Amino acid sequence: MTAVSATTLSTRIGTLELEHPVLNGSGTFDAIAALRAFGPSLRERFPFAAFVSKTITIAPREGNPPPRLWEAPAGLINSIGLPNKGLDGFVAHDLPVLATLPVPLVVSVAGFGHDEFARLVEAIGADARVAAIELNVSCPNVKSGCVMGAEPRETLPLLQRLRPLTGKPLIVKLSPNASDVGAVADAAAEGGADALSLINTLRSTAVDPASGRPWLGAGTGGLSGPAVRAIALEQVGVVAARTDLPVVGMGGVQSGRDALDFLAAGATAVAVGTENFRDPGAGDRVRRELAELIARGGKGDAIETVGAPEAVSKSGSIAG
Protein backbone atom coordinates (compact mmCIF):
# COMPACT_ATOMS: atom_id res chain seq x y z
CA MET A 1 0.00 0.00 0.00
CA THR A 2 1.25 3.44 -0.90
CA ALA A 3 2.33 5.72 1.94
CA VAL A 4 1.94 9.48 2.13
CA SER A 5 5.22 11.38 2.24
CA ALA A 6 5.50 13.26 5.53
CA THR A 7 7.79 15.83 3.93
CA THR A 8 5.84 16.64 0.76
CA LEU A 9 2.41 15.02 1.44
CA SER A 10 2.64 13.41 -2.00
CA THR A 11 1.00 10.06 -2.60
CA ARG A 12 -0.06 7.78 -5.43
CA ILE A 13 -3.29 6.03 -6.44
CA GLY A 14 -2.27 3.40 -8.96
CA THR A 15 -0.41 5.34 -11.64
CA LEU A 16 -2.00 8.61 -10.51
CA GLU A 17 0.62 10.82 -8.85
CA LEU A 18 -0.87 13.29 -6.36
CA GLU A 19 0.80 16.31 -4.75
CA HIS A 20 -1.14 15.70 -1.54
CA PRO A 21 -3.78 13.21 -0.33
CA VAL A 22 -6.91 15.42 -0.29
CA LEU A 23 -9.53 14.96 -3.02
CA ASN A 24 -13.19 15.95 -3.33
CA GLY A 25 -16.07 13.54 -3.10
CA SER A 26 -17.95 13.15 -6.37
CA GLY A 27 -20.80 15.63 -6.69
CA THR A 28 -19.83 17.76 -3.69
CA PHE A 29 -17.82 20.53 -5.36
CA ASP A 30 -19.06 22.26 -8.52
CA ALA A 31 -15.76 23.17 -10.16
CA ILE A 32 -17.43 24.71 -13.21
CA ALA A 33 -19.51 27.10 -11.08
CA ALA A 34 -16.45 27.85 -8.95
CA LEU A 35 -14.42 28.70 -12.04
CA ARG A 36 -17.12 31.13 -13.14
CA ALA A 37 -17.15 32.73 -9.69
CA PHE A 38 -13.42 32.89 -8.97
CA GLY A 39 -11.75 32.65 -12.37
CA PRO A 40 -7.96 32.27 -12.58
CA SER A 41 -7.51 32.47 -8.81
CA LEU A 42 -9.17 29.06 -8.42
CA ARG A 43 -6.74 27.49 -10.88
CA GLU A 44 -3.82 29.09 -9.07
CA ARG A 45 -4.90 27.62 -5.74
CA PHE A 46 -7.12 24.65 -6.48
CA PRO A 47 -8.14 22.99 -3.20
CA PHE A 48 -7.81 19.35 -4.25
CA ALA A 49 -4.97 17.16 -5.53
CA ALA A 50 -7.29 15.69 -8.15
CA PHE A 51 -10.83 16.56 -9.15
CA VAL A 52 -13.56 13.91 -9.15
CA SER A 53 -16.48 14.81 -11.41
CA LYS A 54 -20.17 14.38 -10.71
CA THR A 55 -21.31 10.92 -11.74
CA ILE A 56 -22.33 10.66 -15.37
CA THR A 57 -24.59 8.11 -17.03
CA ILE A 58 -25.16 7.14 -20.67
CA ALA A 59 -28.43 9.04 -21.00
CA PRO A 60 -29.23 12.42 -19.46
CA ARG A 61 -31.03 12.22 -16.11
CA GLU A 62 -33.20 14.82 -14.38
CA GLY A 63 -32.71 13.19 -11.00
CA ASN A 64 -35.20 12.49 -8.25
CA PRO A 65 -38.29 14.60 -7.54
CA PRO A 66 -37.91 17.30 -4.88
CA PRO A 67 -37.38 17.72 -2.01
CA ARG A 68 -33.91 16.23 -2.41
CA LEU A 69 -32.07 17.30 0.74
CA TRP A 70 -32.62 17.01 4.49
CA GLU A 71 -30.21 18.54 6.98
CA ALA A 72 -29.70 15.97 9.72
CA PRO A 73 -28.29 16.90 13.17
CA ALA A 74 -24.80 15.72 12.20
CA GLY A 75 -24.92 15.33 8.45
CA LEU A 76 -26.94 15.57 5.28
CA ILE A 77 -29.41 13.19 3.67
CA ASN A 78 -29.49 13.57 -0.10
CA SER A 79 -31.75 12.02 -2.68
CA ILE A 80 -30.34 13.75 -5.74
CA GLY A 81 -30.71 10.83 -8.15
CA LEU A 82 -27.63 11.37 -10.35
CA PRO A 83 -28.88 14.32 -12.44
CA ASN A 84 -26.45 14.87 -15.31
CA LYS A 85 -26.20 15.75 -19.00
CA GLY A 86 -25.41 12.20 -20.08
CA LEU A 87 -22.22 10.99 -21.73
CA ASP A 88 -22.52 13.09 -24.88
CA GLY A 89 -23.45 16.25 -22.99
CA PHE A 90 -20.60 15.78 -20.54
CA VAL A 91 -18.03 15.29 -23.29
CA ALA A 92 -19.33 18.26 -25.27
CA HIS A 93 -19.86 20.78 -22.49
CA ASP A 94 -18.30 19.86 -19.15
CA LEU A 95 -15.16 17.95 -20.06
CA PRO A 96 -13.52 20.83 -21.99
CA VAL A 97 -13.87 23.07 -18.92
CA LEU A 98 -12.83 20.47 -16.35
CA ALA A 99 -9.78 19.63 -18.46
CA THR A 100 -8.44 23.14 -17.78
CA LEU A 101 -8.11 22.43 -14.05
CA PRO A 102 -4.48 22.26 -12.85
CA VAL A 103 -4.93 18.78 -11.34
CA PRO A 104 -5.67 15.29 -12.69
CA LEU A 105 -9.30 14.70 -13.66
CA VAL A 106 -11.14 11.62 -12.38
CA VAL A 107 -14.49 11.01 -14.06
CA SER A 108 -17.17 9.20 -12.07
CA VAL A 109 -19.43 6.93 -14.12
CA ALA A 110 -22.49 4.80 -13.35
CA GLY A 111 -24.32 2.29 -15.52
CA PHE A 112 -27.49 0.31 -15.02
CA GLY A 113 -25.86 -2.83 -16.33
CA HIS A 114 -22.56 -4.10 -17.68
CA ASP A 115 -23.19 -2.83 -21.20
CA GLU A 116 -23.76 0.75 -20.03
CA PHE A 117 -20.66 0.66 -17.83
CA ALA A 118 -18.65 -0.71 -20.76
CA ARG A 119 -19.77 2.10 -23.08
CA LEU A 120 -18.87 4.71 -20.48
CA VAL A 121 -15.46 3.24 -19.67
CA GLU A 122 -14.56 2.86 -23.35
CA ALA A 123 -15.54 6.44 -24.19
CA ILE A 124 -14.08 8.15 -21.14
CA GLY A 125 -11.01 5.92 -21.02
CA ALA A 126 -10.10 6.83 -24.60
CA ASP A 127 -10.00 10.56 -23.80
CA ALA A 128 -6.48 11.79 -23.05
CA ARG A 129 -7.87 14.57 -20.84
CA VAL A 130 -9.06 12.02 -18.28
CA ALA A 131 -6.55 10.65 -15.76
CA ALA A 132 -8.68 7.99 -14.07
CA ILE A 133 -12.22 6.62 -13.84
CA GLU A 134 -14.27 6.12 -10.69
CA LEU A 135 -16.89 3.38 -10.94
CA ASN A 136 -20.00 4.26 -8.96
CA VAL A 137 -21.31 0.73 -8.47
CA SER A 138 -24.27 1.72 -6.30
CA CYS A 139 -26.76 1.36 -9.17
CA PRO A 140 -28.88 -1.78 -9.68
CA ASN A 141 -28.09 -4.20 -12.49
CA VAL A 142 -31.20 -4.14 -14.69
CA LYS A 143 -30.75 -7.84 -15.48
CA SER A 144 -30.32 -9.20 -11.96
CA GLY A 145 -31.97 -6.44 -9.93
CA CYS A 146 -28.99 -6.45 -7.54
CA VAL A 147 -26.85 -3.43 -6.75
CA MET A 148 -23.55 -4.08 -8.52
CA GLY A 149 -21.45 -2.97 -5.57
CA ALA A 150 -23.42 -4.82 -2.92
CA GLU A 151 -22.44 -8.42 -3.67
CA PRO A 152 -19.13 -9.96 -4.82
CA ARG A 153 -20.98 -12.03 -7.43
CA GLU A 154 -22.04 -8.75 -9.08
CA THR A 155 -18.80 -6.81 -8.63
CA LEU A 156 -16.35 -9.41 -9.97
CA PRO A 157 -17.91 -9.98 -13.42
CA LEU A 158 -18.39 -6.24 -13.85
CA LEU A 159 -14.70 -5.54 -13.27
CA GLN A 160 -13.70 -8.47 -15.46
CA ARG A 161 -15.78 -6.91 -18.23
CA LEU A 162 -14.38 -3.41 -17.78
CA ARG A 163 -10.70 -4.01 -17.04
CA PRO A 164 -9.67 -4.88 -20.63
CA LEU A 165 -11.39 -1.77 -22.00
CA THR A 166 -8.95 0.85 -20.66
CA GLY A 167 -5.46 1.27 -19.33
CA LYS A 168 -6.61 4.16 -17.13
CA PRO A 169 -6.77 3.54 -13.37
CA LEU A 170 -10.16 2.18 -12.29
CA ILE A 171 -11.26 3.30 -8.82
CA VAL A 172 -14.22 1.33 -7.46
CA LYS A 173 -16.44 3.29 -5.06
CA LEU A 174 -17.75 0.86 -2.46
CA SER A 175 -21.11 1.05 -0.72
CA PRO A 176 -21.37 0.83 3.08
CA ASN A 177 -24.73 -0.87 2.55
CA ALA A 178 -23.08 -4.09 1.34
CA SER A 179 -23.52 -7.10 3.60
CA ASP A 180 -19.73 -7.70 3.53
CA VAL A 181 -17.76 -4.74 2.23
CA GLY A 182 -14.49 -6.65 2.60
CA ALA A 183 -15.70 -9.41 0.28
CA VAL A 184 -16.81 -6.83 -2.29
CA ALA A 185 -13.37 -5.20 -2.06
CA ASP A 186 -11.75 -8.59 -2.66
CA ALA A 187 -13.93 -9.09 -5.74
CA ALA A 188 -13.03 -5.65 -7.11
CA ALA A 189 -9.33 -6.36 -6.59
CA GLU A 190 -9.60 -9.77 -8.25
CA GLY A 191 -11.38 -8.18 -11.19
CA GLY A 192 -8.55 -5.73 -11.80
CA ALA A 193 -9.41 -2.56 -9.90
CA ASP A 194 -6.50 -0.17 -9.34
CA ALA A 195 -7.92 1.45 -6.21
CA LEU A 196 -10.97 1.54 -3.96
CA SER A 197 -12.88 4.48 -2.50
CA LEU A 198 -15.27 4.34 0.43
CA ILE A 199 -17.67 4.98 1.87
CA ASN A 200 -20.57 6.06 -0.27
CA THR A 201 -23.67 7.28 1.59
CA LEU A 202 -25.68 5.18 4.03
CA ARG A 203 -29.31 4.40 3.23
CA SER A 204 -31.54 6.68 5.27
CA THR A 205 -34.75 8.66 5.34
CA ALA A 206 -36.33 11.67 7.02
CA VAL A 207 -39.91 12.31 8.17
CA ASP A 208 -41.84 15.52 7.59
CA PRO A 209 -43.05 16.50 11.09
CA ALA A 210 -46.10 18.24 9.65
CA SER A 211 -47.44 15.29 7.66
CA GLY A 212 -45.73 12.29 9.19
CA ARG A 213 -44.72 11.21 5.70
CA PRO A 214 -41.24 10.92 4.17
CA TRP A 215 -39.76 14.35 3.55
CA LEU A 216 -37.72 13.37 0.51
CA GLY A 217 -39.48 13.22 -2.83
CA ALA A 218 -38.08 9.76 -3.54
CA GLY A 219 -38.82 8.55 -0.01
CA THR A 220 -35.27 7.59 0.89
CA GLY A 221 -31.78 8.96 0.40
CA GLY A 222 -28.20 8.64 1.53
CA LEU A 223 -26.67 9.99 4.75
CA SER A 224 -23.25 11.65 4.68
CA GLY A 225 -21.25 13.95 6.92
CA PRO A 226 -19.88 13.63 10.47
CA ALA A 227 -22.64 11.18 11.44
CA VAL A 228 -21.06 8.46 9.28
CA ARG A 229 -17.38 9.10 10.14
CA ALA A 230 -16.96 6.32 12.69
CA ILE A 231 -18.59 3.82 10.33
CA ALA A 232 -16.39 5.00 7.47
CA LEU A 233 -13.22 4.66 9.54
CA GLU A 234 -14.14 1.10 10.50
CA GLN A 235 -14.90 0.07 6.92
CA VAL A 236 -11.74 1.70 5.57
CA GLY A 237 -9.78 -0.27 8.16
CA VAL A 238 -11.48 -3.52 7.16
CA VAL A 239 -10.81 -2.98 3.46
CA ALA A 240 -7.21 -1.80 3.96
CA ALA A 241 -6.51 -4.94 5.97
CA ARG A 242 -7.71 -7.18 3.13
CA THR A 243 -6.09 -5.66 0.07
CA ASP A 244 -2.88 -4.02 -1.07
CA LEU A 245 -4.82 -1.64 -3.32
CA PRO A 246 -4.74 2.08 -2.53
CA VAL A 247 -7.81 3.20 -0.59
CA VAL A 248 -9.44 6.64 -0.77
CA GLY A 249 -11.20 7.14 2.57
CA MET A 250 -14.22 9.39 2.91
CA GLY A 251 -17.18 9.95 5.15
CA GLY A 252 -17.42 12.98 7.42
CA VAL A 253 -13.97 14.46 6.78
CA GLN A 254 -14.12 17.99 8.19
CA SER A 255 -10.59 18.66 9.40
CA GLY A 256 -6.96 17.68 9.14
CA ARG A 257 -7.45 15.57 12.27
CA ASP A 258 -10.21 13.62 10.52
CA ALA A 259 -7.99 13.14 7.48
CA LEU A 260 -5.13 11.86 9.62
CA ASP A 261 -7.50 9.38 11.27
CA PHE A 262 -8.39 7.94 7.86
CA LEU A 263 -4.72 7.69 6.92
CA ALA A 264 -4.06 5.93 10.21
CA ALA A 265 -6.87 3.49 9.41
CA GLY A 266 -5.12 2.54 6.19
CA ALA A 267 -6.24 5.07 3.58
CA THR A 268 -3.82 6.32 0.94
CA ALA A 269 -5.85 9.49 0.34
CA VAL A 270 -9.01 11.10 1.67
CA ALA A 271 -11.96 12.87 0.09
CA VAL A 272 -13.87 15.83 1.48
CA GLY A 273 -17.57 15.71 0.66
CA THR A 274 -20.40 17.19 2.71
CA GLU A 275 -18.08 19.73 4.34
CA ASN A 276 -17.67 21.42 0.93
CA PHE A 277 -21.29 22.62 1.14
CA ARG A 278 -20.60 24.36 4.45
CA ASP A 279 -17.12 25.60 3.57
CA PRO A 280 -16.13 25.81 -0.12
CA GLY A 281 -12.51 26.19 1.01
CA ALA A 282 -12.60 23.00 3.06
CA GLY A 283 -10.24 21.07 0.80
CA ASP A 284 -7.41 23.56 1.16
CA ARG A 285 -8.05 23.94 4.89
CA VAL A 286 -7.98 20.18 5.49
CA ARG A 287 -4.73 19.92 3.54
CA ARG A 288 -3.10 22.70 5.58
CA GLU A 289 -4.29 21.27 8.89
CA LEU A 290 -3.07 17.81 7.90
CA ALA A 291 0.36 19.17 6.99
CA GLU A 292 0.59 20.98 10.34
CA LEU A 293 -0.39 17.86 12.28
CA ILE A 294 2.17 15.74 10.48
CA ALA A 295 4.89 18.36 10.97
CA ARG A 296 4.18 18.49 14.71
CA GLY A 297 4.11 14.71 14.92
CA GLY A 298 7.77 14.35 14.02
CA LYS A 299 7.21 11.52 11.56
CA GLY A 300 9.95 10.23 9.30
CA ASP A 301 9.95 10.18 5.53
CA ALA A 302 6.53 8.53 5.38
CA ILE A 303 3.51 8.37 7.61
CA GLU A 304 4.14 5.01 9.22
CA THR A 305 0.52 4.47 10.21
CA VAL A 306 -0.65 4.66 6.61
CA GLY A 307 -1.17 1.25 5.11
CA ALA A 308 -0.63 -0.56 8.39
CA PRO A 309 -3.40 -3.17 8.22
CA GLU A 310 -1.98 -5.02 11.22
CA ALA A 311 -3.85 -2.39 13.26
CA VAL A 312 -7.09 -3.98 12.07
CA SER A 313 -7.83 -7.65 12.42
CA LYS A 314 -8.99 -9.74 9.47
CA SER A 315 -12.41 -9.92 11.09
CA GLY A 316 -12.61 -6.15 10.88
CA SER A 317 -12.20 -5.11 14.50
CA ILE A 318 -9.68 -2.51 15.57
CA ALA A 319 -6.85 -4.19 17.44
CA GLY A 320 -6.17 -2.84 20.92
Language-model region placement:
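C-terminal helical cap(s) of enzyme catalytic domains, especially alpha/beta-barrels
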Residues: 64-73, 207-221, 263, 275-300
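Glycine-rich phosphate-binding active-site loops on the catalytic face of alpha/beta enzymes
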Residues: 53-58, 136-139, 195-205, 252-253, ...
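N-terminal capping/small domains of soluble enzymes
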Residues: 1-105, 110-112
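Hydrophobic faces of well-ordered beta-strands that scaffold small-molecule active sites
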Residues: 22-26, 49-53, 105-109, 133-135, ...
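Extended, intrinsically disordered, low-complexity segments
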Residues: 229, 284, 288-320
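Catalytic cores of alpha/beta
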Residues: 33-40, 117-127, 178-191, 241-243, ...
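Glycine/Thr-rich beta-alpha phosphate-binding loop at enzyme active sites
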Residues: 76-77, 139-153, 184-245
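Glycine-rich beta-to-alpha transition loops that act as phosphate-gripper elements at the mouths
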Residues: 108-111, 174-180, 229, 245-257
